[in-house]
Amino acid sequence: MKALRKAKRILFISLLVLMIIITIIYVYNKIQLKREAKLFTPLGEIVEVNGHKISIYTEGHGEKTLVFMSGGGTSSPILDFKSLFSQLSADYRIVVIEKLGYGFSDIVDEKRDIDTILNQSRAALTQAGIEGPFILCPHSMSGIEALYWAQKYPEEVSAIIGLDMAVPEAYENYKLNMPLIKAAAFANNIGITRILPGIAESEAIKHGTLSDKEKEIYRAIFFRRTATKTMLKEVEEIKNNAKIVDNGKLPKVPILMFSSNGSGTGWNEKQWTQFQENFINKISGGKIIYLNCSHYVHDHEYLNIAREIKAFIS
């Protein structure tokens, strides 16, 4: 009996200590969020779509419009793409869409099927006065949206430039670890991510050309836009969304794909490359360029990619 009482006492004390630690972290996080509020000022224009605010960033005044579409879970699409689009804005009009749940856009707890996502992207561009046709530049998971865009509204898409973009085949046997993803969301919501060294240091911060001020802004956004409810809904729908695109017709537009070494994708290099090769081989005149870097290719090889994009468009 004494041993049992001692065990219960130890368990009670342990839980109490844990609760105190979590409370301290939570309060600290709230204080930091308040201090960082001044950094969370939209870098572009905010438009309203169906009662929700969506962030749209534009730069440059070229005849052709490049629309950058971020990968799943990228906290700050604008700053993530900046190293690359700053190399292109002298020649083209640059647009970055920050979907709901990302960057400076609203967080919503709504279904994220492919039609909803695409309709919101198109409506946001219309609200911002941006007209097509567009050269879509999707990273990772946004490759699915870009392909669907070209399938459904071919007159609006003149080309696709995939920045290590995902293709439908990649999600056929994709196993979602929703408990882990939701645990990450919980950890960020209560502030645990703040005490994990280096977790806010994105590829854009580590390898891109962001200024110290922009890095500071990125970190502030990270703690507000990591594993948001909207992102979780998006992940839950990705297999269905990919299947819809896979069942559609192949886009009849020029496609250039930049392919990474697979690091950071969840697949090994051989698997990841095979997915992309299988897809591009079906596209008439499609081209793939291999890069020996990890998944966020635009943060590593921005100079090389910018050069190839200019050659491709010309």
Residue ranges: model-predicted function:
Residues 210-284:
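Conserved serine/cysteine hydrolase catalytic core
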Residues 290-302:
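Catalytic histidine-centered segment of alpha/beta-hydrolase-like enzymes
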Residues 138-142, 146:
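Gly/Ala-rich beta-loop-alpha elbow adjacent to hydrolase catalytic centers
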Residues 134-135, 159-161:
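Residue in the alpha/beta-hydrolase core beta-strand immediately N-terminal to the catalytic nucleophile
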Residues 55-104:
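Conserved HGGG/HGGXW glycine-rich cap/lid loop of the alpha/beta-hydrolase fold
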Residues 96-137:
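Active-site loop/oxyanion-hole signature of alpha/beta-hydrolase fold enzymes
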